[in-house]
Every structure is written in C-alpha cells, then in structure tokens.
Swiss-Prot record:
Involved in pyrimidine base degradation. Catalyzes physiologically the reduction of uracil to 5,6-dihydrouracil (DHU) by using NADH as a specific cosubstrate. It also catalyzes the reverse reaction and the reduction of thymine to 5,6-dihydrothymine (DHT). This is NAD-dependent dihydropyrimidine dehydrogenase subunit PreT. NAD(+) binds at E286. It catalyses: 5,6-dihydrouracil + NAD(+) = uracil + NADH + H(+); 5,6-dihydrothymine + NAD(+) = thymine + NADH + H(+). Induction: Transcriptionally regulated by IscS.
Length: 412
C-alpha cells in the first residue's frame, strides 16, 4: 500500500442515504439493549432513532449529552464487545453498525458547524485536571457544565494523550481529535501544555490553587521483557508515537515481528503494513479464543495482510532471531525479522503522586476519591477496562463525584 494511506481512514464513512438505510434496519427497541451496553451512556438507541427520522441535529445532541469524545469513540470503540453485542437485530441477520452511524452524525455535526456545547458559567470555583487524555477531557466538559472553572495540565506539547500519540491516523485522523479539543476549549476549558507534575509544578501547588484536583494520567510508557534487555528492539508505544508524529513518513523494514496480541500490537502491525512493510507477523501467548485484541482491530490487521500466530511465548533471542515455545504443546518455533517490536503492556509514571500510594499502575479510590479527600483519580490509573470509552465513563463519573464532594451532597 502507498505511504499516503497512513493519513486516510481505512473504514469508509456513511453517506446520509446509507446512514438512513442502516438506521432503518433498527428494530427500535423500547428498552434498547445497545444503550444499556454503552459504558459512556451515549444512548445509541435514541440517536439511531433520530437518524431514522432524518433528525441529525437531535442525534448529535444525544451523543454530546453524554460523550464529549463522540467522534473519537465512533472510530476507536470496540463496539462488537459493547453496544453492538446487545443489538437485537443480530438475531435477525447482523447487528446495526453503530460505530459508523455515530461517526456519520459527529462528522455531520462538524461539517455543518453545530455548536451544541455552550460556555460555562465558572461560578463554583477552580478545579485542576492532570492529563489531557480522554478521561481528563471528558471530566473537563462535565465540570464546566456544572459551573466550575477548569484547567487541564498536560505534560506533552499538545493535548490528547494516547489519542494523539498512539492511535494511528488511519484509525483516528488528527483533524477529528483537534476538532473535539477545540470544541472543549470553546466552552472555556483552559489547557496548559508542557506542564508536568513533579517537574514544572507540584500536586501541593495545584491543591492550594484549586478546590479539587483530578489525576487522569495515562499508561504512556511501554513495558519491556527481561529477555530482550540487551537486544535491538523497539517498544510499541515508541514506534506508534514516532509514526504518528511523522505522519507516517518513517523508514520501514522489509520484515517485522511484533510480540503481543492486544490492540496496541494490532495497531503496530497495521501501521507497518499500511506503510509498506512486506512481511508482518504478530506472535501472542494467548490463543485465539482468548485473544486480547478487539475483533475489529484483529480483523482489520488480518485484512491488511498481517500474519498472526497464537499460543506462543518467547524463550530465547539471538540478534534478529526469536525462539518461541507453545504455551500448551511441545515444540519450538524460531523466527527472524529485520525489526522486532514489543507490544507487551504499558505503565504509568506515578512517581510524582507517591503521597497517593499508587500500586502497579493503579491509584486506589473510593467513588474516584483518593486517600487525600481533595484529590480524585480517573482513567487508566483506576481499576477497570482500559479502553477510550471507559476512560470517558470514569472521567464523567469522577467529575460528578467531585461536584458532590464540593457541594457537600455526599460523604464520599
């Protein structure tokens, strides 16, 4: 595939006629299972009904009521595990393509210049958010709507977190993310980049200047394996960030071996194929029936020509050769490649939050409140799923917990 395809979305968008046609397949369930299955409460049942009746503005309002990153989630959500898994239409033929319908609506919103969000009143005092990833961005919208003056502090040069630095542009175009963030800033949310807690500012400083602080730092650092400590390998998150920042203009090997089977591994493999790598192989210790990658990402990688080997774990490495053993069966497999990339997990840098007593990438909370009652946490660093839509969910719920705490509405 030509290199410029890195900037083109792999999945085509619905036209208005195709969107209405797809929405007309909906059985219009009274108590829609798809809506119950959405972690962010985006309410697909309601916005699909609006599409069916050609009320695209109403559909956009439904999405934005609960999801400030509706256009992002439309593209990156594992819908087959969530809303589409509950679709009643699946019992007839196939589930409604909810993600593409949501993408159609949010694209229509952007193209027609809708302004659903309004500026906040900022009457209830200041709240600081650490991290401009999906949890922090969603929390800022919820808090602004409640009347708070919100400032997000982001360590990178641009906001977005993993959405900007990790997800390939053929899955999430930069223009889509930029539009989401511009919409949030227009509400009155202040985003201060190049501000890292533990470097340019401290948690104590933010506590002194704000009524509450919400920590939403993500799992931005890639993990390695001891076996590969002295090998010439690249960590998956570093590769994805390098490709994204260069808009795909990077040197590509003739062959690549990715170790890992999650969504990040699939993103690495798909990126390599889109950019022209001839032979890309993913080797994962999980077998196919328990594969961690979403079906959408797995299928997309396979369609691009990625080879996937399941049930093998690395046991030895020599130069560009890796030897694997099957997790259940006897026998070994040795593979060589021009480039080896590790996609075996990610971790957060929480040294600056030692007073919150983080343990293994997690800050313990009760109703999102940490051991310090003024400090809350959400996103990847709290227990639960690590998808974007769950980050949106926790960001919204943490914002509501902050509001209840500050207003004395609960004893959380």
């Amino acid at each position: 595939m030509p290199q410029q395809n890195y900037l083109d979305e792999l999945t085509p968008a619905f036209t208005s006629l195709l969107a209405i046609k797809e929405a007309s397949r909906c059985l219009l369930c009274h108590d829609a299972p798809c809506s119950q299955a959405c972690p962010a409460q985006t309410d697909p049942g309601k916005f699909i009904r609006s599409i069916y009746f050609r009320n695209f503005k109403g559909a956009a309002e439904t999405i934005r009521e609960n999801n400030a990153l509706g256009a992002v989630c439309a593209r990156v959500c594992p819908t087959e595990k969530l809303c589409q898994s509950g679709c009643t239409r699946a019992g007839v033929d196939a589930p409604i393509d909810i993600g593409r319908l949501q993408r159609f609506v949010t694209d229509f919103e952007q193209q027609t210049g809708m302004e659903i969000y309004q500026p906040g009143t900022k009457t209830l005092g200041k709240v600081a958010i650490i991290g401009a990833g999906p949890a922090g961005l969603q929390a800022s919208v919820t808090l602004t709507n409640q009347g708070y003056d919100v400032t997000i502090y982001e360590k990178e040069a641009h906001p977005g977190g993993w959405l900007r630095n990790g997800i390939p542009q053929f899955r999430l175009p930069q223009s889509v993310l930029d539009a989401e963030i511009a919409r949030i800033e227009k509400m009155g949310v202040t985003i201060k980049c190049n501000n890292e807690v533990g470097n340019t500012l401290t948690l104590e400083q933010l506590k002194a200047e704000n009524r509450a602080v919400l920590v939403t730092v993500g799992l931005s650092s890639g993990s390695g394996l001891p076996l590969f400590e002295h090998s010439d390998v690249e960590i998956a998150v570093d590769f994805l960030q390098r490709a994204r920042q260069a808009q795909g203009d990077i040197s590509i090997p003739q062959s690549a071996l990715i170790i890992g089977g999650g969504d990040v591994a699939m993103d690495v493999a798909s990126t390599l194929k889109v950019l022209g790598c001839q032979a890309v192989t993913c080797v994962a210790r999980e077998e196919l029936d328990e594969f961690p990658a979403s079906e959408k990402e797995f299928t997309s990688a396979r369609e691009l020509g990625v080879s996937i080997i399941d049930g093998f774990t690395p046991v030895a490495v020599e130069g560009n050769k890796v030897t694997f053993k099957h997790v259940r069966l006897s026998g070994e497999l040795t593979m060589a490649a021009d480039k080896i990339i590790l996609a075996v997990g990610q971790h957060a840098r929480l040294d600056a939050f030692a007073e919150l007593e983080p343990q293994r990438n997690t800050i313990k909370t009760q109703n999102y409140q940490t051991r310090d009652p003024q400090v809350f946490a959400a996103g990847d660093i709290v227990e639960g799923d690590k998808t974007v839509v769950y980050a949106v969910k926790t960001g919204k719920e943490a914002a509501e917990a902050i509001h209840h705490y500050l207003e004395g509405a609960c004893s959380c």
